[in-house]
Amino acid sequence: MFGKMEMDWQIEEFMLYCRTRQLRKKTMGSYEQTLRLFERWCREKLDIATVDRISENVIRRYIADLQERGKYSFYAEEQTKQKNHPDRRRDFRKPISVTTINNYLRNIRVLFNWLESEEVIRKNPMKKVRLLKHNRQAKEYLSDEEMRKLISRMDKSYFPEHRDYVMIVLMFDTGMRLGECSSLVMRDVDLSSRRIMLRAEITKGRKDRIVYFSAKTETILRRWLQFKDRYVDTDYLFPVKRSGNPVSVCNFECNFKKYLARSSLNPNVSPHCLRNNFAKRCLMNGIAWCFYLIRAFVSIYKSSSCSFCKLSQTPRG
């Protein structure tokens, strides 16, 4: 059963396997980017081109190299460097975070677990490799005052900022993820009952989920729909004005950083912080609502770990 060993070929086979499993494009993109980077590093740094020559020691050398070289100092393809000019980035060669390195290791582990299950390799080099340890930090969140400051500085006469304003309010009010919010279409939203159906194909857990929003958010959504329909004819709830396609996560994240800077707020706050805020408000809503909140929290937030609850209750200094 031990067949073709070239790493490049095996990555192609693995990606084909991922497509047959109907994994999300984002997941497959993460796998391929990580694996192509690792494949080129093995080939250029160690002259290794086959998966059977990858050992535990090779993996550990790769980890050490990641820790030493810094961000964007190695790339999967020459075209990537020529197109993106990583050396012009402000964070060029800054340390790669432990979280990022661990994500790389998880993706590499998935490949070698698959190779082992397919009997392409006899020994799995990732079997004894552990994720790097790092100190978990309390989740970032915005206070009510900071939230008001953030949205008050947004220009709602300008299409992109009006769209982003409504997205921020909606995520803050419902606890939905950015990727879920950006993928919404008109039929997902029921304004009369003030609820949104998050379809299985856009949720992280691949299960339908319903979230509810307030009367104030309903008013904001109705105004947005009137505004949007004057400029774009699309079924997407939060489109890009020119194309009518849904705003990308990357686009929104870049805009969000700009809004934080404009409001002189913590630059480390991310859009996911709005989801943290939602969970924190649920947890702090009073002991009398305990059973209701637990059911709502599990249903809406779908958190897989109670560790979030502990971290989100940590007061800010």
Outline where the language-model segments fall.
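N-terminal core-binding DNA-recognition domain of tyrosine recombinases/integrases
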Residues: 12-29, 35-138, 153-157
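Alpha-helix N-cap/helix-start motif at helix boundaries, enriched for small hydrophobics
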Residues: 28, 108, 167-168, 175, ...
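A short, glycine-centered helix-capping/turn motif at helix boundaries
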Residues: 119, 170-183, 285-287, 296-299
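DNA breakage-rejoining catalytic core of tyrosine-based enzymes
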Residues: 121, 134-149, 204-216, 231-235, ...
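Basic, Lys/Arg- and aromatic-enriched nucleic-acid-binding interface segment
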Residues: 121, 135-136, 149-178, 232
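Short, basic (Lys/Arg/His-rich) helix/loop patches that form interaction surfaces
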Residues: 155-159, 233, 253-294, 301, ...
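Conserved tyrosine-mediated DNA breakage-rejoining catalytic core shared by Y-recombinases
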Residues: 178-179, 183-223
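Active-site/catalytic core of tyrosine-dependent DNA strand-transfer enzymes
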Residues: 214-266
